[in-house]
Amino acid sequence: MFGSIAGGIASALAGGLMGKLFGGGQSADSTGIQGNVLASDNNVVGANDAGIKSAIQGSTVPNSQEAAPSAISGILADSGKHALSSLTNAGANKLMEAVGLSKSASDKGKDTKDYLAAAFPELNPWERAGAGASSPGMQDAGFQNQKELTKMQLDNQKEIAKMQNETQKEIAGLQSITSRENTKDTVYAQNEMLAYNQKESMSRVGAILENTSLTKQQQTSEIMRQMLTQAQTAGQYFTNDQIKELTRKVGADIDAVRANTARTHVETDRSKQEVQNSRYASSQVGKTAKDVSNAITDTAGSIVDYFRGADQKVADVYNNYFKDGKSKGIESNHRSK
């Protein structure tokens, strides 16, 4: 576009200068043949004859109405043309330089580089060239994507944690219900087993005491065997001192039963006292059987009497294990009234 403008301006300038410098016809007279005729020896031939004009002048025939240019005028015309051409070229070059059309691509690139270096000294050449112009945009887009991904991950983690929490609550609820049911069933079964064991123990101990064919030592051994077996089944174990104390107490109860039974057999009259003694002997057998059973199944506090001289801490642990409040336990002969 700038080239077209510059060319138009140059053409206008050249045309104007040519018109001013060389406008109008030439007034100088020409020498040689004048007019429209060509003289020969015998004939006069008209100069306007086309064939003659062509033969003499060539293909370009000068205008017969204008004077032929002289040599001086031709030199001046050539000089003027060269001067005008020089002026026109110089002006056009200046104009093109002003608008930046006369420089090569490398020169223009150098000028742009120098301009950017002066205008933006804080930037490096790569940044001034614009090569990194898209990098901030790409980084920003990547940062936004990372933010979105992080947010999605956090949301997913929250949802997963919520689901896990709800699941754990449901599991805990089921476990609690199951545990309560199991505990209820276990306690019921334990109570049933406790009642059964107590009944069985009383029956066996009573049978042993009523078996008069057994000696005191045999009765004591059988009762102690029953007691220790039940204790081991319940997970309770006694020390040697505790076993000795239990054996002594059982032996004392057996002596009382034997004495009352013998006294009942010796007395022959069926007096009131005999009936009372007989009833006492019978009740004493049942009482002893129950007391021995309670020592294994549900003794609350009186088992301490069996453990006199033994470790008090062990006795407390044993009493706590059989704490159900159902029985007074085995009453000691040495218990203060």
Curated annotation (Swiss-Prot):
Keywords: Capsid protein, Viral genome ejection through host cell envelope, Viral penetration into host cytoplasm, Virion, Virus entry into host cell. It is found in: Virion. GO terms for cellular component: viral capsid. It comes from the Viruses. Its main location: virion. Pfam families: Microvir_H. InterPro entries: Microvir_H. Minor spike component of the viral shell. Involved in the ejection of the phage DNA in the host and is injected with the DNA in the periplasmic space of the host. Involved in the determination of the phage host-range. The virion is composed of 60 copies each of the F, G, and J proteins, and 12 copies of the H protein. There are 12 spikes which are each composed of 5 G and one H proteins. This is Minor spike protein. It comes from Escherichia phage G4.
